[in-house]
Amino acid sequence: MGETMLPTRRLLVLGAAAALLTGCQTTPPLDPGTVIGTIRVDVSRLVELGVGPRAEVVRTRLEQELARAFAGMRQPGGATLTVAVRGLTMPTYVGGDIDDGATSDYLESLVTVTGRKGEVLATYPVLSMNGAGDSGFWFSPGIDERRVERLIVNHAAWIKKLTLG
């Protein structure tokens, strides 16, 4: 009986937490007429944390994904979208775990949109997550690269959703 109740309790707790967090996003989406001129991704914090060459991969690929995501609203001289990547977490994954969040990959950033005169138009904290096993078997060649790629694509999608609504 205890085992069958555990998922129900977990869902109840997660549901309550989600309900409490519903109103936490206080920054509204950008105005519909806002155009983006420049996209910058700062990974200096990842370098400080010792992420190594993966930091440059995050910078390059996130810039590419954001350019694709905002392609319809890019215009020279528009606002600047700056993404300061604050953390990349990829725990060791050896498969077989129940997805309880302990084997999840995370990418965290602070997105700031500034106007032509340098005024801050909006700021959005972004935390995206993927299951570590979502990218394939733990023993597959290139699994860590696929995990990073999935995080980047997911993160860019969340940035677009938060900034555009």
Where are these regions (language model features)?
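A structural "domain/chain start" motif
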Residues: 2-7, 11-15, 22-61
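Short secondary-structure transition/capping segments
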Residues: 6-16, 26-35, 112-132, 160-165
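Generic secondary-structure microfeatures
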Residues: 10, 62, 66, 85-89
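Soluble non-cytosolic domains of exported or imported proteins
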Residues: 52-61, 101, 142-150
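Extracytoplasmic/secreted envelope proteins and their assembly/folding machinery
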Residues: 59, 63, 67-70, 149-152, ...
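Sec-exported extracytoplasmic/periplasmic mature domains
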Residues: 67-71, 90, 156, 160, ...
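Surface-exposed short loop/turn segments
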Residues: 72-121, 132-141
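Short secondary-structure boundary motifs at beta->alpha junctions and helix caps
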Residues: 119-158
